[in-house]
Amino acid sequence: DAATLQQVPAQYRPQHGRWIGIAARSTVFVYNPAKISEAQLPHSLMDLAKPEWKGRWAASPSGADFQAIVSAMLALKGEQATLDWLKAMKTNFVAYKGNSTVMKAVNAGQIDGGVIYHYYRFVDQSKTGENSKNTQLYYFKHQDPGAFVSISGGGVLASSKHKAQAQAFIK
């Protein structure tokens, strides 16, 4: 309903108003400042395809979050640039299972940096910080495929038999 939509600033909700964002996750480059300086950070996610990044960065490519990043790259850079990046990625990156594992490896100095969702570091920092104390986050700039933000949203189906309950849940 309109009251629920008004809780979210206009620039962060769809104009048609059929759903609303509930949570957002940013793609970031987590890095270990003891291994890499701010001046050495990749300016773009696309930079990780360059030879100087071989063996220095990690990701968890089997997750839906990473697949969404590739979809964003397709939309922003096109099929050929995405294919070229994926081929270089296969050569350059170290695969880990899960964003937490990537962050832990960066924290331990096993790898210089990695592509993860931002909240993995924030959750760890809110607890002991044990798996992120040696890390920092770098946010890629606007219009870069690495500046991907994933939204979890909700809406009430027109065919719903429980519209009031669904609306209350979303509020």
Question: Where are the predicted features?
Answer:
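Loop/turn elements at helix/coil->beta-strand transitions in domains of secreted/extracellular proteins
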Residues: W53-R56, G109-D112, S132-T135, A164-A166
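Small-molecule pocket liners
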Residues: R25-V28, V70-S71, T135-L137, S150-G154
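Extracytoplasmic ligand-binding site segments that recognize negatively charged/polar headgroups
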Residues: D1-I111
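Short beta-strand/turn micro-motifs at beta-sheet edges
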Residues: G17, Y139-P145
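Short amphipathic alpha-helical coupling segments at ligand-binding clamshell hinges
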Residues: A81, W85, I151-S152, K161-K171
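Short, flexible turn/loop "capping" segments at secondary-structure junctions
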Residues: G21-A23, P145-V149
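A bilobed periplasmic-binding-protein/Venus flytrap-type ligand-binding module shared by bacterial periplasmic
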Residues: V30-K35, V149-H162
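A ligand-binding cleft/hinge motif common to bilobed small-molecule-binding domains
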Residues: G113-N134
